[in-house]
């Protein structure tokens, strides 16, 4: 976006995006930060991992996990429309693909093994930290992840 231009229109659009994102996560008396952010906390709790990098790596796998859970409204249609893939036959796969494309276009890390962070032997402790994170209170209704579920997401992201 902006093709590298540093003009007023580009900066106004960027600022608008920042404000909309912040409104989306922070409201008076509540937050909408949820499972992806909890993963970020779990992955950065003891290691020298930048939280944004952790989010970039796990977001596609967390979304895939959410979309696979029966009876959980992960708002796939809303996400698909927001990402411009609302007409896709498989909206869940299209959302995961779109998020992956954004991450890759930003040249962010794609695998946990590429970060200076936890190793697979640490995944149980990371999963326990994710589940204990306060933002897990904001997961979609009906989602009740286990340590094994979280470890599975971490293994997929490895």
Question: Predicted regions span which residues?
Answer:
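Active-site segments that bind and position negatively charged phosphate/pyrophosphate groups
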Residues: 1-91
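C-terminal charged capping/lid subdomain of soluble metabolic enzymes
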Residues: 82-158
């Amino acid at each position: 976006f902006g093709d590298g231009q540093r003009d007023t229109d580009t900066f106004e659009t960027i600022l608008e995006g920042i404000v909309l994102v912040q409104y989306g996560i922070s409201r008076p008396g509540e937050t909408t930060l949820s499972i992806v952010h909890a993963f970020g906390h779990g992955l950065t709790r003891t290691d020298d991992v930048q939280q944004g990098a952790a989010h970039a790596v796990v977001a596609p796998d967390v979304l895939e996990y959410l979309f696979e859970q029966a009876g959980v409204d992960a708002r796939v249609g809303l996400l698909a429309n927001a990402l411009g893939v609302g007409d896709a036959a498989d909206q869940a796969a299209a959302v995961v693909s779109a998020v992956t494309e954004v991450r890759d276009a930003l040249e962010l890390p794609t695998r946990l093994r590429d970060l200076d962070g936890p190793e697979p032997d640490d995944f149980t402790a990371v999963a326990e930290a994710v589940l204990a994170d306060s933002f897990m209170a904001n997961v979609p209704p009906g989602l009740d992840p286990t340590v094994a579920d979280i470890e599975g997401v971490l293994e997929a992201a490895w």
